């Protein structure tokens, strides 16, 4: 397994293992994350941990399963296709406001584009269809 693949898998598997510290240990202090669907930038380890806890609050039973990892020829970049599933039993906090629990299950496919340097994640962007989440949770029809 390419070292970059190992790092990005550790990052995503930390969500599934309910272990944000495992993910944080391979995030550079000056890492820049961006949630493209929400239009939010999340700089550094603390922002990563806050986002982890925001998601875990909304989906306490949430599971993150990596489906594919493709590493670029230069070895710095990886594309990670993964699937998040969970039941919305907690408040879903977002840039659009806070939504009360719906008790409904959501299953959404994501794509992360991540850059790894010297064994640390230095940049990442998540792409997903937020309308799919809203429909599955009954927030829109």
Predicted features along the sequence, with ranges:
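C-terminal and inter-domain tail/linker signature
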Residues: 1-141
């Amino acid at each position: 397994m390419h070292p970059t693949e190992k790092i990005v898998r550790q990052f995503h598997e930390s969500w599934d293992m309910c272990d944000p510290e495992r993910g944080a240990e391979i995030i550079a202090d000056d890492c820049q994350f961006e949630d493209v669907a929400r239009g939010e930038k999340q700089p550094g380890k603390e922002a990563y941990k806050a986002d982890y806890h925001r998601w875990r609050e909304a989906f306490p039973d949430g599971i993150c399963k990596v489906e594919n990892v493709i590493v670029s020829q230069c070895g710095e970049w990886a594309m990670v296709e993964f699937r998040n599933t969970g039941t919305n039993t907690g408040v879903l906090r977002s840039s659009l406001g806070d939504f009360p629990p719906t008790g409904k299950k959501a299953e959404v496919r994501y794509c992360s584009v991540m850059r790894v340097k010297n064994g640390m994640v230095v940049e990442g962007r998540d792409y997903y269809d937020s309308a799919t989440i809203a429909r599955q949770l009954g927030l829109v029809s």
